Amino acid sequence: MYAVFQSGGKQHRVSEGQTIRLEKLDIATGEAVEFDQVLMIANGEEINIGAPLVVGGVVKAEVVAHGRGEKIKIVKFRRRKHYRKQQGHRQWFTDVKITGISA
């Protein structure tokens, strides 16, 4: 059984027991969270596709950890003009473990 749900402007395909990395959620570590924007639920040969959301579809998860991703560097450069700017960015994330999928 798997489901596709939307969180943080992205769509994620998950199954029970899977741990995924999402955009930062303002929920404490160890707490439960429910995602109700479920786009699709598949259970064997039975596939339930929403229009746009599955009615009554819920993905339940538990927050495992919060953190920051790898640093990316942004460079702005003009040749021969002695001009260079460099900037870094680390995006916040939340790791969640999927505990249940229901339709």
Swiss-Prot record:
One of its GO terms (biological process) is translation. GO terms for cellular component: cytoplasm; ribonucleoprotein complex; ribosome. GO terms for molecular function: rRNA binding; structural constituent of ribosome. This protein binds to 23S rRNA in the presence of protein L20. Part of the 50S ribosomal subunit. Contacts protein L20. It comes from Yersinia enterocolitica serotype O:8 / biotype 1B (strain NCTC 13174 / 8081). This is Large ribosomal subunit protein bL21. Keywords: Ribonucleoprotein, Ribosomal protein, RNA-binding, rRNA-binding. Belongs to the bacterial ribosomal protein bL21 family. It holds the Pfam family Ribosomal_L21p. The gene is rplU. PANTHER family: 50S RIBOSOMAL PROTEIN L21, LARGE RIBOSOMAL SUBUNIT PROTEIN BL21M. It comes from the Bacteria. InterPro entries: bL21-like, bL21-like_sf, Ribosomal_bL21, Ribosomal_bL21_CS. NCBIfam families: L21 (TIGR00061).
